[in-house]
Swiss-Prot record:
The RT polymerase active site binds 2 magnesium ions. The gene is pol. This is Gag-Pol polyprotein. It comes from Friend murine leukemia virus (isolate FB29). Mg(2+) 3 binds at D1455, D1514. GO terms for biological process: DNA integration; DNA recombination; establishment of integrated proviral latency; proteolysis; symbiont entry into host cell; symbiont-mediated suppression of host gene expression; viral genome integration into host DNA; virion assembly.
Amino acid sequence: MGQAVTTPLSLTLDHWKDVERTAHNLSVEVRKRRWVTFCSAEWPTFNVGWPRDGTFNPDIITQVKIKVFSPGPHGHPDQVPYIVTWEAIAVDPPPWVRPFVHPKPPLSLPPSAPSLPPEPPLSTPPQSSLYPALTSPLNTKPRPQVLPDSGGPLIDLLTEDPPPYRDPGPPSPDGNGDSGEVAPTEGAPDPSPMVSRLRGRKEPPVADSTTSQAFPLRLGGNGQYQYWPFSSSDLYNWKNNNPSFSEDPAKLTALIESVLLTHQPTWDDCQQLLGTLLTGEEKQRVLLEARKAVRGEDGRPTQLPNDINDAFPLERPDWDYNTQRGRNHLVHYRQLLLAGLQNAGRSPTNLAKVKGITQGPNESPSAFLERLKEAYRRYTPYDPEDPGQETNVAMSFIWQSAPDIGRKLERLEDLKSKTLGDLVREAEKIFNKRETPEEREERIRRETEEKEERRRAEDVQREKERDRRRHREMSKLLATVVSGQRQDRQGGERRRPQLDHDQCAYCKEKGHWARDCPKKPRGPRGPRPQASLLTLDDQGGQGQEPPPEPRITLRVGGQPVTFLVDTGAQHSVLTQNPGPLSDKSAWVQGATGGKRYRWTTDRRVHLATGKVTHSFLHVPDCPYPLLGRDLLTKLKAQIHFEGSGAQVVGPMGQPLQVLTLNIEDEYRLHETSKGPDVPLGSTWLSDFPQAWAETGGMGLAVRQAPLIIPLKATSTPVSIKQYPMSQEARLGIKPHIQRLLDQGILVPCQSPWNTPLLPVKKPGTNDYRPVQDLREVNKRVEDIHPTVPNPYNLLSGLPPSHQWYTVLDLKDAFFCLRLHPTSQSLFAFEWRDPEMGISGQLTWTRLPQGFKNSPTLFDEALHRDLADFRIQHPDLILLQYVDDLLLAATSELDCQQGTRALLQTLGDLGYRASAKKAQICQKQVKYLGYLLKEGQRWLTEARKETVMGQPTPKTPRQLREFLGTAGFCRLWIPGFAEMAAPLYPLTKTGTLFEWGPDQQKAYQEIKQALLTAPALGLPDLTKPFELFVDEKQGYAKGVLTQKLGPWRRPVAYLSKKLDPVAAGWPPCLRMVAAIAVLTKDAGKLTMGQPLVILAPHAVEALVKQPPDRWLSNARMTHYQALLLDTDRVQFGPIVALNPATLLPLPEEGLQHDCLDILAEAHGTRPDLTDQPLPDADHTWYTDGSSFLQEGQRKAGAAVTTETEVVWAKALPAGTSAQRAELIALTQALKMAEGKKLNVYTDSRYAFATAHIHGEIYRRRGLLTSEGKEIKNKDEILALLKALFLPKRLSIIHCPGHQKGNRAEARGNRMADQAAREVATRETPETSTLLIENSAPYTHEHFHYTVTDIKDLTKLGATYDDAKKCWVYQGKPVMPDQFTFELLDFLHQLTHLSFSKTKALLERNYCPYYMLNRDRTLKDITETCQACAQVNASKSAVKQGTRVRGHRPGTHWEIDFTEVKPGLYGYKYLLVFIDTFSGWVEAFPTKKETAKVVTKKLLEEIFPRFGMPQVLGTDNGPAFVSKVSQTVADLLGVDWKLHCAYRPQSSGQVERMNRTIKETLTKLTLATGSRDWVLLLPLALYRARNTPGPHGLTPYEILYGAPPPLVNFPDPDMAKVTHNPSLQAHLQALYLVQHEVWRPLAAAYQEQLDRPVVPHPFRVGDTVWVRRHQTKNLEPRWKGPYTVLLTTPTALKVDGIAAWIHAAHVKAADTRIEPPSESTWRVQRSQNPLKIRLTRGTS
């Protein structure tokens, strides 16, 4: 077999985790797919020798890196992270790369002089892209060599390799040189420079191997400078005997600094030095930082390219070191290079490295502190010696010290006041007091001896106790022997006869032993029971019987725990960690002392008496888990002591079964395991392999076309980011995602839709399943009518004659239906799996779960596919509920044949059933939560136990859970609605949860009813139904039955609460409502079959002739349409029902006539009549009037006789006519108290309320049918109360607005006229804001201050002694304080402006004169916080001056503008405008990104106009992007960002945007073309040739002449290109341009020199800042903020990072004072990023 070849690319892919870790350490991110693409496709095209399989050759990697880092359009910024990571792997190879990396070649050539023999070459592979399989170099890292100075002739370091060096011997003990070399003698003359360069190898080297003795530039004897290049030995020694720049930049910077100061290197030497000591990336960073340090003429860093290139060139300059100018350039260059080294050496902050510095076991605190400070200097920008950082260093010193020292330092008193020196001294004391190793060994030895001594003493004591016990037992034995001898002597010899080996000692019979003797009273001893879940004995151990202690084994959290029954323990105890603990704790007192322990959280425990919630005490040091009295009480346990030991049983004597488990796993307790009676054997699985999910795989409905999901017309794609997901959850759902990908159900995609994935943990396991949150998608998809069958009545189609059943559950049913490719993008979600190379979106190709229409779509598809099966098998009943199938047959054979046909059909159609859940050909099956057996449906025991086991609810949510679970079983509970009536009010939101006796009784009744739930027959649609109905206290109860022989078999128990209106009717009418409600519910089960209603009332006559005084027309019509349908509903004879069963009693009940009962029903007052009383004391007429007058509704009520008004009153505005009628009638009844009264009213509402409806309202609690409070509740209650005041009463209804001369007509007209007049004439007694009616103060309350008196004196007011107040203009004067309180209160009510409030006060009469009203009102309105935050403000800021360039191409403004329609993908226009000339450049783009901006800037603007100095833009994402700003920094461009939400700041380019778009619009209208890109040159031509503010066009400013309108090419143009006249023309153009440019620049500068102060805001002022995007009911202004810095047009405020234009702020107090004499001073601080502002007088 062949062996796979390992390549660098495959090696990195095999160790991809390490590659990602390396990239992460470099602060970059790499992707596997792009890694392969760049290595195999991109980098081989660079023509530097990069193979397609990759290489670790550093030279080739460097060449590729140079290509990638190339500036301009030829660079590849997207490949930077990948080549940097590849280089890091090659430079610092991990273990799996080292065998494949070339060792560095030795810095030597073949020796030119005798020297040591060269080392044998390493067997390394040749430099190639393909490496041999396994070739590993030596693992030992050679120590750096210190080479002597070269003695040979000088060589060219740039073209030749360095000379050979002999291998130095081991260093001398003092480290000053090699062992075989002698230092030079003292007094020797210094050699000349030439001698030092040409000395032989026999001369000893210098002591410092890192310092060269030949300086590159030195002064010779003739005054000329001589150049001496660096020797290769110096470069080698510097590189190998110093750390790299990345490891310790400070040390290498110090070395280079000394070399620069002492050697005076040239430009070439500096490049050689940097290239030797630094890597390529480090060198680039140093050069970049050095160029940033170049300063301009003003002493500040400059960004001008020419100044930077002059001071720090990147190419070799022509600096002559023999001239002073050249030497000055070199000195300046070295200074800049040193600054670049220092700036580049500032490594990024890495506090993790600092935290990793910990004190060693034997390290002193002082040494540890030095290491800590060094880490701060190396890995952070902070100086540990800075007093401001002393606190951080001190805390790190405490936390990272040795554990014993750190704990003691933390406990020091007044730790905050301790300095770092104090902490070090304390740490030194603790360190010095540590015990020495000898002392520690002595202490351990002493403790060991003491422990051994105690153990020996305990052994001796134990031995003595054992001997004492043995003597005591021996004494008892001897006493027994002596007693037996005495009895033998007294009674003779009584020896027991000898027994055979199989003889019983009790009955003396052979064949059994005594313990199995059947003649013993307790019978033979049975086999010992084995305890599985519960055991009363321990399992014992190693052949020994466990102690007879009562024990019970409980299963806690899935693990069995054996408890010791301890009646002395008050609480039950767990010893192992049970999971989360609560915050509660308890003090436990034991034999050895007391200690505090914590409680566990509540655990739900299922006991023999039901499920309870219990909390255990967690005591880890308890020797055994204890079952205390608290849980024994809940168990109702009984402990019996017998001869074999103690036994613990329940209250009924049964063994206890105790189990602790999670609530979500509770249902599994009650489900019976699948019995082995009908297993799915190999026959069913082998005969139909395509029908089972276990053998057929994932299903696919072959007859169903792919589904297209229609969207709503206004729907737009929704994209929601993936929620954060834990690592455990991601790993949990990863296998499911992988499985679905392998099956093709999930596929990668790119979609504008995205919804998050939610991992849901499966209960009781550590497995997760992926669930997609499709709620937002569901909102945007068209709704379809759900056709899924109702499980409530689905079984109505199953006749009782079919009693053989098969139940099938389809596996992954929704995944059987395909999605159309156009709809697959709707269900995309994010998923990243680096190991599989997946990073993007996945979507479903099948119908997903969680989609709202999935059940309906699948249900309809499966119905269509199974239609043929139903036609071919008419004798079988097939019920389908989504993916649950029930097949019913009359015989076992038919059921088996039908099941086979169904399985064959499902397999052919592509559906798969679950073999684990299948129930095939059984007479008893579970379907939809019901137990089907013998034509009846039962509640399953599991469902009963679930309801019975729930603890007493303590919250509304728990109660809703209980009612929901029990409500599913309501068909089996007679009168469920009445039972649960006390519970439902507690489930309402906002209701106080109070669990009382009534609720507990209802709770227990529902549970008890479930235990006795009967079997319900399946509805037989071939037989009629009978509905027995009863009603009690507003609750309808009934039972739906069918005849089964002579008996009535219940089909369902129905119950429901009547609405509040029907609940207030008489009993006979309530029965009508009850029958109507239950008939509607029964119709869901009868499916339109005939229904006979049996009730104890003759309701048929009531329905046919309903009393109109009780029922509304709408309700009457509804009842008649429902109950008088004779084809479906019939009424049976009147029967008396048993209240328990709701079935008829054998004896007949008392008969009554419902019509007679209703006729006798009366209202509130029995003697109330509607006929006039002949002997009445008074006859009155009442009326209420409500009408609109001048836009206001006025109302009044009156009580009159025929000729005079008895009582009349105006009612509050807005009162309705019905309410006014009730008030008038109630007032008449009150005035006639104790008298006989006839009262007439023309209001049907008031008449019906008094006679009929009032009592009905009172009975039903004054609620409407919806349960809401009725209108005019207070007036109705007052009327019902006033009905009993007169002695005798008659309320008579008369028509309103009658004509004629009858008494009723005259009285009614009189009452109506009086009500209208009083409503018009009088003002209702309501609270108003008029001062004269509700003045808060009187004259006596006024208190005038001294300031008030002065102001009053100036006004000329006089003091009135009688009124005791000041008077002005005939009105009492209100003091200033009272005026402020009144006006402030008025402003808080209205928040009107100053002018409108003043106008309001002047228009309304005021009895007082308000002192200083206008001034006070102005202060109140201007200082109101709410008004300041909401009211708009006029901008008083003057227009600023725009900064322009001083020549063309130096200052540009840039902006994006959107142009619609976007043809060919071009939707945006990138506009450049030169602020000096107005020249415009515009480029159509497809995207609005920073990449587009930088590309156009470098490819279009820079080559044609030169590098700009200033760029001005708004704060768009493309301009504030890091890419744009980085490019600007590299190019030295000053990028100015304008104020946010201030388009005037970019006014020139914004105006040009408008001009271009207007021109394009006109051109498209004129030409008829929609291609604006084609018309753009014409628009630019117009913009460039339009005169500006100075009368010149941008073309004329730039080119010095107008553009040629017509230009025909001349064929002889080439002949005159070198004509002298052409040169003269160019010179003239130059002169014209300067003549034009200079005045323009002067005009622009004149605008800037004008002293303008646009805004009055100063540092320290308080301002409000405008919100540019306000939400609903959000203030328009935010703040106030304090001004920190100002410019002529913008402000910097505290709390907002960006600058704010002055037009976007307003003063918090508009009364801005003029500038004072104080001035602000700016001072520098130690931090270069901070300034200090001080204020003082000038």
